[in-house]
UniProtKB/Swiss-Prot annotation:
UniProt key word Cytoplasm: yes
Keyword Repeat: no
Entry protein name: DNA/RNA-binding protein Alba 1
Recorded family membership: Belongs to the histone-like Alba family.
Residue spans crossing the bilayer: none
InterPro entries: Alba-like_dom_sf, DNA/RNA-bd_Alba, DNA/RNA-bd_Alba-like
GO biological process, one term: chromosome condensation
Organism: Methanopyrus kandleri (strain AV19 / DSM 6324 / JCM 9639 / NBRC 100938)
Top-level division of the source organism's lineage: Archaea
Primary localization class, coarse: cytoplasm
Length: 93
């Protein structure tokens, strides 16, 4: 799987780890950073986007938000629906 550029995958680590990752991407010259999460990490992804915008980089705007559902297969062979979110933050040039 090719690694996407300027994407921060939110999981179970502390929120500030992901905030720092976003700020680092912007400081390295990225005009756009995508924050992706699924399941219980969705609320943490929203927190990351809001902290970046409100506390650290007020010039950054939310460009797009995409929500969806992924079907995952369990070890027993059942399928489970998992919600996903992608938040695109943009730094005006």
């Amino acid at each position: 799987m090719a690694e996407e550029e300027n994407v921060v995958y939110v999981g179970s680590k502390p929120v500030m780890n992901y905030v720092l990752a976003c700020i680092t991407q912007f400081n390295e010259g990225a005009n756009e950073v995508r924050i992706k999460a699924r399941g219980r990490a969705i609320s943490r992804a929203v927190d990351v986007a809001e902290i970046v915008r409100n506390r650290f980089m007020p010039e950054v705007e939310v460009k797009d938000i995409k929500i969806g559902t992924e079907e995952l297969e369990t070890e027993e062979g059942d399928t489970v629906n998992v919600s996903t979110i992608e938040i695109v933050l943009e730094k005006p040039v």
